[in-house]
Structure formats: C-alpha cells, structure tokens
Amino acid sequence: MFKKFKPVTPGTRQLVLPAFDELTRQGELSGKKTRKSVRPNKKLSFFKKSSGGRDNLGHISCRHRGGGVKRLYRVIDFKRNKDGIEAKVVSVEYDPNRSAYIALLNYADGEKRYILAPKGIKRGDEVISGEGSPLKLGCCMTLKSMPLGSTVHNIEMRPNSGGKLVRSAGLAAQVIAKTPGYVTLKMPSGEFRMLNEGCKATIGEVSNSDHNLCVDGKAGRKRWKGVRPTVRGTAMNPVDHPHGGGEGRHNGYIPRTPWGKVTKGLKTRDKRKSNKWIVKDRRK
C-alpha cells in the first residue's frame, strides 16, 4: 500500500510514499499506544560513514552522490546458514539502506539475525532453513529441494556464497526446469539462467512491492537520500565534458560519456565472459 498527500505545499502535491502498514510498531512490542517505528537491534547495526561517491584517492568514482541524512547499517544474513533451528519473527522493520523491508528473527537458541522480509510475513511467524524445510513463506533451502513453479528470492550464484540475486523490493524469480546438477530460473528481467542445484534461495517474493510507485515530490527529498543533481554535458565547459563549450547547443559528434567513450550502442560486455549459464537472454 502507498499513501498520497493533499497538496498543502508544492512538495506534497506530487508526493507518494509507502504506507508502511507491514512494519511492526513499538506499541505492539511494549503494549503502549504508540505508532513509533521499532528501533534497530543495537548488536546488529553500526554507523557506516558515507563515501560521497569518492574512492580511496578522493576522486569521484560514482557521480550524483553526496550529503544525505546519517544512516545505521543493519547487518543482514544473506547466507541463511543456521540450518535446522526454528526462528520466530520478532518484528518487520524499515531499512534505509535498501528498498525492501527487513525482518528480525529470534532463533530457538537465542541468537538474533536480520533477513530480507518476504511479502506477507508478519510478527509471530516461524521460519527455518536447511534441507527438509517446509515450503513455507520465508523458509530457505537449496534449489533442488524446491518444486517447479516455486517463487523465490535472495538466490545464491554459488553454493554457500550468500544470496546475490533478486533482493530488491517486489522482485521474485521462478523455478522453471531441473536438469542433473542444475536448476533453471526465470529472473525478474526475463532472463532464463541456470544455477547449481546446491545454491540456496528463500521462498516468496521480496516485500514492499509498491516501491516503484513512490514519487519523491521535490528535489529536497532526493537530497535527503544522498542523491545530487544530474548536470547535462552540453551545459558544462570543454574541460569538464566532451559535449561542453561552443557557441550553440550542438556538440558536433555522437554522444559520449564524461570520459570520452561512446555512450549509445557501444557493447561493453567482456567477450571472454561465459554465456553458457544464460539459457535465454533478457533482450531476446
């Protein structure tokens, strides 16, 4: 669900934000009447200094980054390697470092971990990981244990390497076929990809599926997120961009990046990189 605002100010005229109905509130944990968000677990969060888009030399390595509010980084368990131990969902929380929500698990042995929250999971639900786990929302197991047609997310590219694929809000992949040693998945991009059957994945779709419908409403909200303005190359000086300078607006040649490379149509994929795991390309 998402929330639209009355146009009380210019910034709220176009503003569309998530309703955050799935999140657990402090009142649910304490019994008090309050709508405040649950604070992150202290042992599973730490302050991470913003890079501002700079590398170790201080040079801009990623443009349009800088500023923004301070964030606490939440340590997420992408490996889900605590096999055979049941865990109960304590809370579903907001994470400023990613588009999806996160869920705090309390394992039967007392350990707590954060995971990516699947869509529909709520406080009090029980999950488990490992071989023989039930086909239940939030449970984690190897791809070979999943029936055809299963919807999965947080998928490993190599066994025991931790989930790398399908982690953004609202995404899900589908188990399409099985061959000896490998499982074929249909990715959110439309690509069909083969993965080792020993790779782990989590049942369900990633939470916050309305994330793509949100509208920031004003430039200032982008700045709060640490996003700086994008300046056109033709508006720059020749020293700053290949399109810069000149008396008119025409740059006189094909579009190029700030570093002089052709920017439209030039293939950038390494020719030596293997395509044997891609059954069907997302572009075809």
From Swiss-Prot:
Entries under SMART domains matching the protein: Ribosomal_L2 (SM01383), Ribosomal_L2_C (SM01382)
Segments of skewed composition (Basic and acidic residues): 240-250
Entry-linked Gene3D superfamilies: 2.30.30.30, Nucleic acid-binding proteins (2.40.50.140), Ribosomal protein L2, domain 3 (4.10.950.10)
GO cellular component terms, semicolon-separated: large ribosomal subunit
Stretch list, region Disordered: 232-284
Compositional bias annotation for Basic residues: 264-284
GO molecular function terms attached to this record: rRNA binding; structural constituent of ribosome; transferase activity
Pfam families per UniProt: Ribosomal_L2, Ribosomal_L2_C
Taxonomic superkingdom: Bacteria
Keywords linked to the UniProt accession: Ribonucleoprotein, Ribosomal protein, RNA-binding, rRNA-binding
Example GO BP: cytoplasmic translation
Summary of the function given for this chain in its UniProt record: One of the primary rRNA binding proteins. Required for association of the 30S and 50S subunits to form the 70S ribosome, for tRNA binding and peptide bond formation. It has been suggested to have peptidyltransferase activity; this is somewhat controversial. Makes several contacts with the 16S rRNA in the 70S ribosome.
Listed NCBIfam families: rplB_bact
HAMAP family named among the record's database cross-references: Ribosomal_uL2_B (MF_01320_B)
Family: Belongs to the universal ribosomal protein uL2 family.
Subunit structure: Part of the 50S ribosomal subunit. Forms a bridge to the 30S subunit in the 70S ribosome.
UniProt-recorded name of the protein: Large ribosomal subunit protein uL2
Organism: Chlamydia caviae (strain ATCC VR-813 / DSM 19441 / 03DC25 / GPIC) (Chlamydophila caviae)
